Regions:
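Flexible hinge motifs at transmembrane-helix junctions and intramembrane kinks/re-entrant loops
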Residues: 24, 121-125, 143-144
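Alpha-helical transmembrane segments
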Residues: 55-67, 121-136
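Membrane-water interface of transmembrane alpha-helices
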Residues: 69-82, 131-149
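Membrane-water interface at loop-to-transmembrane-helix junctions
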Residues: 93-98, 152-169
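A membrane-topology feature that recognizes alpha-helical transmembrane segments
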Residues: 106-112, 127-130, 134, 141
Length: 169
């Protein structure tokens, strides 16, 4: 079975949780959850449920961080926050639309992750999910320069030997 309804529901709420915690902090929480489960396993506790519910759904970075990242990008269009400030909790917005975008981001992150795992793509499925949702957030909600033109001056000024060297390495 490709998708699990319980995982979709958990991803929905994980998205909201990630937005309330803050994107960067979700990685810290993921580490603590992993450490807790490891310690419980070490002392003989059956952690099957904790692994399935917490590690593989609620605190899976491609779900919880995706959600926080997408919600932050959206909040950047409506509130006093830049769309790249994933280290901040979005609780200050008091905006149900931000929570809805985060829930959608969590579900989308899960669906991409589950799809890739179902077909056993030889990639880091979590990373691909984060990249795809991040690009989607950039396309939908970007209000800043996509790139810094000053940093691309070397393209016009570079000599042929520079490009030859770049090609060789």
């Amino acid at each position: 079975k490709m998708f699990s309804l319980s995982s979709i529901i958990l991803a929905f709420f994980a998205g909201i949780l990630g937005t309330l915690i803050g994107g960067t902090q979700t990685f810290i929480c993921t580490g603590f959850v992993g450490l807790l489960i490891f310690l419980l396993e070490h002392v003989g506790v059956n952690t099957t449920f904790l692994n399935e519910a917490l590690s593989n759904n609620l605190f899976l970075p491609c779900i919880i961080f995706n959600a926080a990242g997408l919600a932050t990008a959206y909040a950047g269009t409506k509130h006093e926050i830049r769309g790249v400030e994933t280290s901040r909790s979005l609780a200050f917005t008091n905006d149900p639309k931000v929570l809805l975008v985060s829930a959608i981001g969590g579900v989308l992150g899960y669906l991409i992750f589950a799809f890739e795992n179902y077909f056993s793509f030889p990639v880091d499925t979590g990373a691909v999910s984060v990249i795809l949702v991040g690009v989607l957030g950039r396309i939908l909600f970007n209000q800043e320069d996509t790139y810094n033109e000053k940093n691309l001056d070397f393209l016009e000024k570079a000599s042929p030997s520079f490009w030859g060297f770049q090609f060789l390495i």
